């Protein structure tokens, strides 16, 4: 794998962790909608690390999600629950950003942050097993 791809993977994983950390900070400050957005972007950016491994990218979120489902869920490289986590996070994030009067509770935001942490960990472990993780 070209070094620039490894660097991109590393960068995207670092960005995903930073976004997850931001989600936790926002959750603690009771900014639940913004926390949900950061949780989604932690997952989305982690998936983009996988795409960097494969040498592909998409300009739209739906393209990234579809690729993940096709190449990583349907091939059973990841459990189906991760497809659900990502799809639901995308939908909830859209609602928090664009829907009027969309109410988010602490529990909603906590669940999304927990799922994002699990999701990111799964991707990091996968990349490490592929000998592509951050320490490579």
What is the role of each PLM region?
Residues 1-136:
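Terminal alpha-helical segments
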